[in-house]
């Protein structure tokens, strides 16, 4: 199915090639709004590696920075933001093999979440496709992901390997920073042509669980 999805819709004409990377790079700037020093990744094989996968769009395929799970295939990212976020979409990219995440479960506003807490019902869950080039976005149910100050991403399983490897996690949405006398809203979405939105090729590959 992945071959079918990549073969259609998103043409490789020079016009799209010139404009799309800049637009999508603007959309995925929410990583700048993460309180990175307080970000936690549970079950990472090396301390601090979980922070490395929240990086600029143009580094999304960089294979030098990644996180790998330790004791088993699960990972749990606890992501505090410096303000309030309305999350609209997520990209998660790994290796093109069995170590790629196969399912993620999203929780909001549960600081210091542990694996024991993952037994509760998530706000949303996705079955993933292998996406080594970070091309597939999974759209969130926006009504559930407004006013997010803390996001937890539970990688519950992969495609069969003993450990899971993640290279990039991209977050798209709006950020609201509260000041004493005003509120600044940063909308990380380019004014893109709907025809550029890969709807035809992405939709068949995005499976909602809940």
From Swiss-Prot:
InterPro entries: Galactose-bd-like_sf, PITH1-like, PITH_dom, PITH_dom_sf. Signal peptide: none annotated. GO terms for cellular component: cytoplasm; nucleus. Keywords: Activator, Cytoplasm, Transcription, Transcription regulation. Its main location: cytoplasm. Disulfide bonds: none annotated. The keyword Zinc does not apply. GO terms for biological process: positive regulation of DNA-templated transcription; positive regulation of megakaryocyte differentiation. It is found in: Cytoplasm. The keyword Cytoplasm applies. Pfam families: PITH (PF06201). Residues 19-191 form the PITH domain. May play a role in promoting megakaryocyte differentiation by up-regulating RUNX1 expression. Belongs to the PITHD1 family. PANTHER family: AD039 HT014 THIOREDOXIN FAMILY TRP26, PITH DOMAIN-CONTAINING PROTEIN 1. This is PITH domain-containing protein 1. It comes from Danio rerio. The gene is pithd1.
């Amino acid at each position: 199915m992945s071959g079918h999805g990549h073969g259609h819709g998103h043409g490789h004409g020079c016009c799209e090639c010139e404009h799309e990377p800049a637009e999508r790079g603007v959309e995925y700037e929410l990583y700048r709004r993460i309180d990175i020093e307080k970000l936690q990744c549970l079950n990472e094989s090396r301390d601090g590696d979980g922070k490395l996968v929240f990086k600029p769009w143009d580094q999304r395929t960089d294979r030098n920075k990644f996180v790998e799970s330790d004791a088993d295939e699960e990972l749990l990212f606890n992501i505090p933001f410096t303000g309030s976020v309305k999350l609209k979409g997520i990209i998660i990219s790994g290796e093109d093999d069995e170590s790629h995440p196969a399912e993620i479960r999203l929780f909001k506003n549960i600081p210091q979440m542990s694996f024991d807490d993952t037994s509760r019902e998530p706000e949303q869950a996705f079955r993933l496709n292998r996406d080594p080039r970070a091309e597939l976005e999974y759209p969130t149910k926006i009504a559930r992901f407004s006013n997010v100050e803390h996001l937890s991403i539970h990688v519950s399983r992969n495609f069969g390997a003993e450990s899971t490897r993640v290279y990039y996690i991209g977050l798209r949405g709006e950020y609201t920073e509260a000041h004493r006398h005003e509120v600044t809203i940063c909308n990380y979405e380019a004014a893109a042509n709907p025809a550029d939105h890969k709807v035809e090729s992405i939709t068949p590959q995005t499976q909602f669980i809940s």
